[in-house]
Amino acid sequence: MNNLIDISTLHVDFQLEKSIVPAINGIDLSIKKEKTLGIVGESGCGKSVLALSIMGLIPPPGKVTNGKIILKQDNTEIDLTKIDSNSQLMRNIRGNKMSMIFQEPMTSLNPVFNIGEQIIETIRLHQKVNYSVSKQRTIQILKEVGFPDPESRIFDYPHQLSGGMLQRVMIAMALVCNPLLLIADEPTTALDVTIQAQVLKLMNKIKLGYKPTIIFITHDLGVIAKMADEVAIMYVGKIVEHASVNEIFSNPKHPYTIGLIQSMPTLNRQRNKPLITIKGNVPNPGEIKTGCNFYPRCPKVMSKCKKEEPLLLNLSKNQKVSCFLYN
């Protein structure tokens, strides 16, 4: 199957006054057209930095120091790492060919402008249409994402809307130019449980209707089970396992993946029985100087794990893992 995005040996570093922090440390990843890739990991594992790298939105002092991010379209290939993030070419791609839904809708919209103006601006930046056509398209897309009475409420300002409605506006803005790639960075994190369910239902509707390639970032494996075709498990700037969603849940290999699945609460667990947890905490990027980043927390650690770094190798057609238990 054709890939839309090919990432190879990607490194993203943050240059601090006294040190360099490696946020992404040599990622190789292919994202198939019209499929949903779930990216899972604890906070601090580099999920959002990876997404921002693709979008060309890494904030200073961060920068891509090595590797390629290839966007494939119409028999052409564009290395996004070679394009200035503020250039006209990148502005034409971002918001048009690639869009992103951020995890904090309340801080992602401009409070000075009403929601209609902000979506209309997105359309007119990327498409040669007048204000009237842009307004009608804005009303249409808001209807599609379940925003009530958009004809009159497009004049509402962000502070007048609930978190769920704001996230629908963000989804509408991301979809309005029909992008090839849609990145959803924990789009349900700031919402309550019932609104989360509504947003996930909407995202599945988008998958079927618009058929974009989706990168869905979350720390919730339950969400991934509903949304994803493939899953990449990230830990401290690296992918430690990459497999189909069925393989991840039925046959997880990496001890970190197994730990994440075991720590999921279930309805049929015994009362008063403690939840299973992964011991320890995620180390800071670059803190583990040699060996596997997971060895201080791993229940199956071996002496080799402390000295050498395992490669991400194919176990089968649908599964890769980075662990000395298998290579």
Task: For every predicted segment, state its role.
Residues 183-187, 191-273:
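P-loop NTP-binding/switch modules centered on Walker-like glycine-rich loops
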Residues 76-99, 125, 247-252, 284-289:
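ABC ATPase NBD coupling module
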Residues 156-161, 165:
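Conserved ABC ATPase signature
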